[in-house]
């Protein structure tokens, strides 16, 4: 490769100048010679035409064509090698005589508008040259300046045109080009001979030296460059030979050193083998210690949590018995201490998982606003108990449908807000959620938690995110905790691709903020209620806390309401309002029933009064509703709570659902599928009043067989059924030719965001949450009735939820509403629930006895569904909690307190139901 490159460079350096110079000289001489030939031809033509013009002056004066014709013919024959034609034109530009009638004389004639030449003119056209000169009488001198055109025309007798042939010039040019090319090729050949000789004298020795260097590279250190060389090549030869001699000496010395090093290495290897054996033993001991540590943590999770759950469970059971105040106080202390210890154990286990890298984040679709609303609602109790106002402000540009780990996000919020509650004695705890960055597939959100607590001194801020450390050692004694909460929070935020920081001033409060990255979910998970009915309505809003008021006003600004805000009720402009939202301060501790005059005045000023109550005031909700309050909302107010309450005003003003008569039944054939007899009976009873034909199936197999026999306008499908679940049944039904377009509605009590998307992706047209309410079902039937034009999924509009006391054992009004106001149906549903309780009790008692029976989660799910239609909210919530824990992987033995509480609640339900059923 090197030889070829050198050869090519030498050839280029030799040939390029030769070719370039020869080419330039050839072009110069050819062009110069061509111009000389043309000039010679032009001079020859001039020597012919100018004497001819003088000679023809006399003949033109006499108009003697014959004499002039003979003259030009003689000249044409004498110069026939270059002359093609000679033509004479008179003073009127007419052909007078020509020497060659075979050529078109008009090519030599001047144009009609071209003046006669006053002297010799030359024109060229391709291989033709035309010379023209005037014929002037002897009385005219060219040096004179004629005073008029008339005088010129009198002295101008005509002109002579001579046409010359340039082909001979072209031929001579080609001949000289050919000679130039031959000479240039000859020079190139001579240059090639010299270049070849030079390359042989240079590349030959170089090739010899390259071969010698290659032999030296292969280890033949005795190789030398031989032969006679000139100049620098001889110097290079001597250098290579000297290098080979040096390499040979170095190689000999190196070999000696290698032998010595090999001997030393053998001794070192023997020592390393001994050390490796010791390291291997130490590694095995370390692995065994790590294994024992992992087993210890796993055992601690079970051995500590199980007895703690037992302590908590039996403490709760004991608290339900008759106790003295001292005993109740002691038991409450035991329960709080056990819960604190359980929280510490959970923190330690989470920290261990994070340290080991075994904590895996989920990636599921979820509604961001509902998720944050849920965790803030849980934290509101402890915040309001301390008299702290808790607010949640989610900016309107923050996307709601996202994909991530909602439980870990809630854990982060819980840790940060829990710390804020712990270290704040009065004031506010404000949560602000903003969009930081947005792309087509991802969103980065920033969450700020601001409190008015004790703050953190600057000297203690550096160790805030260290494990088992707190800013002040006395904090753990006063407030409890392990110092792991912020460490776990920081690691969770980092796992979500974000970071966390804070700013704090002693005695002024702290602000913690973090940002995380979430994927955008293109599908709609939850749509809010329609607020168009609020257009043109006036709302009076009273809230003494400015931060809480601002958050609520931001929500109201997204509605068409006209809002009148006042920080106090007394400052509210006296007028009549369509709606009024009255916020009660969290520091207000008097019973609201004592504010009778104030509430009565508020009721008189509006058609629909809503109260925003702190948690400790919720006990008065039922009594307040009896006094004319339209809705009692739990603080902090969020869109998921406030907007449905506002739209309830529309239903308060007009009844959108008219009683269904036999004549108003929808012309539909609907099939309902549910393995729970109570659920199936209720759905069937509701459908009988709304549609003309109803088919009931208690299994997925039966539903598929019935779908083969007849077409349906709509199918209500339970999801969790034995043998064949609702998703599989939906797939098989849609495979039937006459059922391909039949809408299948998923009926589920687990309307979690991720499951909703899974159901819609599996072929379900829509979903209906349990417990089924009459108004929801009727709206669904209206949208999917034949001819309604609904061909794609439509999100079920929100129906206002009734106020339910979650701690009520039996709410007969709720049971009646769930049974569409039918007393007999409500009694039947309650009786079916009581008949099912013994089976559940046996299974739960087997679990508590350590027998680990199969099918517990399915039985709890079935009980959960039955509770949804029987007006037993407390037992329904217990079933939901137990089922969620079991499906999330929690072991049955870890749920011992909840199962004991469920057994106790079964007894309470049976006792309360006996009073109604007799």
UniProtKB/Swiss-Prot annotation:
CDD domains: HAMP (cd06225), HATPase_EvgS-ArcB-TorS-like (cd16922), HisKA (cd00082), HPT (cd00088), REC_hyHK_CKI1_RcsC-like (cd17546). Residues 200-252 form the HAMP domain. The chain crosses the membrane at residues 11-31, 176-196. InterPro entries: CheY-like_superfamily (IPR011006), HAMP_dom (IPR003660), HATPase_C_sf (IPR036890), His_kinase_dom (IPR005467), HisK_dim/P_dom (IPR003661), HisK_dim/P_sf (IPR036097), Histidine_kinase_BarA_N (IPR019247), HPT_dom_sf (IPR036641). The modification Phosphohistidine is found at residues 302, 861. Residues 299-520 form the Histidine kinase domain. Residues 32-175 are periplasmic. It is found in: Cell inner membrane. It holds the Pfam family sCache_4. This is Signal transduction histidine-protein kinase BarA.
